[in-house]
Every structure is written in C-alpha cells, then in structure tokens.
Design a protein with these regions (language model features):
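A short, charged/proline- and glycine-enriched loop
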Residues: 1-3, 161-162
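Residues at the starts of beta-strands that form the adenosine-phosphate
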Residues: 1-2, 32, 93, 124-125, ...
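Structural beta-sheet core signal
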Residues: 4-5, 96
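A short, glycine/small-residue-rich beta-strand->loop->alpha-helix junction that serves as a flexible
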Residues: 5-21, 73-75
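A short beta-strand-loop structural module common to alpha/beta enzyme folds
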Residues: 6, 29-46
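Short, surface-exposed alpha-helical segments at coil->helix boundaries
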Residues: 16-24, 131-134
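Extended catalytic core of nucleotide-activated donor transferases of GT-like folds
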Residues: 45-136
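Donor nucleotide-sugar binding/catalytic pocket of nucleotide-sugar-dependent glycosyltransferases
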Residues: 124-138, 142-161
Length: 162
C-alpha cells in the first residue's frame, strides 16, 4: 500500500505554509508527493483537465491512500476533477486534510459551501481543525464521515528544500 499527499505549488500565503508543514511530516513518514500546480484551470477544457488529472494521479495504484490537502487553491472544478481521477482506483482511501474553506478565502474559484460539501462527502476520512468546523459542515450537508482533529498549526518545523 502506497501513501501519497498532495502539495500545490505556485501559491503563497498561509495556505502555502500549512501545506509545507504537512509536507515535512509526510516526507519524514516516507509518503510520496502528488504535485499540483496553481494555474487558471478554466484554460483547460473538461477533456484536457481529465487528461491532466490522469497524468497527475498516474503513480497512484489500487489500495493506495491519498491525503488531499484541501483546498488545492486552484479551484473547485480542479479539485472535483482530481478527486474523480483518484476515486477511479480500486480500494483507494481518500483523506481530505481541510486546511481552510475555499469559499471564504478564494471566492472566485470556490463560489459556495454547497460545492465544497459535495467534494468533502467524497472522503473516506476528514482531518479537520475543530469540532466546531465539523458541526458547521454537518449543518451544510456533510455526511457521517470519520474525523480526526488537527488543532495545532503553529509549531516549529524545518523547511524542506526541493
């Protein structure tokens, strides 16, 4: 069984820092990276984006586990195509590590909570920041999905040079 984590490149801010924190831990545990790149996904047709996702997810095999650092900050459409490609793998376990709500920080690409809930409902496990976050998501339609809480972000780590 292989374990993967996603990391989005070409973005800044606190979401980039959060992704780096997860990256450091994931590398120490021997997990493999699925590299995502922030770009205007609207420049791809649906077929082009589907092909892109097949290439991005090509290292993933049946029985793998993928930790998706959500949101990717590319956009809801991109995230939906990514999860579609991942879910094609037999016995795949998809974990959403919810670092923020896209609709609160990137409204142009994540227009509303309903689309985000649809994505989150694809998960086999959620990593959330708090019980309050889970309750908020449930109020907006989140199904019963197992949850782990990651409540602390501000801890020291060594930056990984690629």
């Amino acid at each position: 069984m292989n374990i993967f984590y996603t990391k989005t490149y070409n973005m800044g801010g606190t979401n980039a820092v959060k992704q780096e924190i997860v990256e450091v831990s994931a590398r120490k545990l021997g997990y493999d990276e699925i590299s995502l790149f922030k770009f205007d996904d609207q420049s791809d047709s649906d077929e082009e984006l589907k092909i892109r996702m097949e290439a991005i997810t090509s290292p993933v095999t049946a029985g793998s586990t993928v930790i998706f650092q959500y949101p990717s900050m590319v956009g809801g459409r991109y995230d939906r195509f990514l999860t579609d490609a991942l879910k094609k793998h037999q016995d795949l376990k998809l974990i959403f590590f919810v670092e923020d709500f896209g609709f609160e920080i990137y409204k142009e690409k994540y227009p509303d909570i309903e689309n985000e809930i649809e994505l989150l409902n694809r998960a086999d496990l959620l990593i959330l920041q708090s019980v309050q976050m889970k309750e908020y998501l449930k109020e907006h339609g989140l199904k019963e999905i197992p949850v782990i809480y990651q409540v602390m972000w501000d801890y020291p780590y060594e930056k990984v040079d690629n």
